[in-house]
Amino acid sequence: MSWLETYRGTVYRWEVDNVDHFTVAYYFARFEDATAAMLDALGLGREAFAAGRFSAVLDCRVRYLKELRVGDILHIRSGVTGADETGLLLGHEVYNSGDGVLCTTVEQRAVLMDAGSRTPLPLGGAERRAADARRVPWDGGRSSSTDHPEPADDRGFLDTARDTVKAWEVDTLGEAAPPAYIHRFSAANAHLLAGFGMTPAYMRERVRGFSTFEFRLRFPGALRAGDLVRVRSGLLHVGNSSMRILHRMANARTGEVVATLAQSGVHLDLAARRPAPLPDDLRERAKGMLVG
């Protein structure tokens, strides 16, 4: 049982969003650092890449427990929560280093891939033993508010984001890095909310915002520099203050779905930093947009 510190840093001014939270895309940049350090400790980082193999994260669950804001200092500790020949489960815990409070938990499913064919490879015995040496206790929350049946198609979904992958957004494998996906999903979320009246003007005037408390991110494919991107989004649930949203990102040239994000969040009172009931008129408009 051995946790490994995999990141230590701070939240910069340009990394906060319009509700004054550490922006989720920059969380994912930190998760990327933590994952790289953890895989390297297991011999599945550059050492594996030099041998024609690489590790890919296919599924990621994130729970946001406490806010991080500009100027906060943070660190991440990581470990293995499960391992077999099909791959690894990695767990990361994000702490506010100033007060020691656990802010975020992340669980990822990673698989070993052949760099040439991009097909899955089994984890060998030595690799599984290295993973077992890094096993940690984990209660990061496998039961999830984002674990719900998803619509089979996009009927009723809205077009919410469209652009092109830039060269500076790709990682060492030549694929779009996780923050590139999250930035687009964040833009898509803003367009979906505006569809029932939660526009930027509404949020400024009412001192309201949208705060995510849980993500489930999946990567069935990948994007590369120059690919055209399209995101379609659907509203799956509306409560008193809570909402559940599904985003699907596709390569606009081929139609291949490359990433999905199931997102749970709340209508937030920015002054009180607490969930606030949706106004009745917005809730009714939102209910008219429900899909699935």
Located regions from the model:
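HotDog/MaoC-like acyl-thioester-processing domains
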Residues: 3-7, 63-73, 79-150, 219, ...
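Hot-dog-fold acyl-thioester-processing enzymes
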Residues: 1-59, 111-214, 269-292
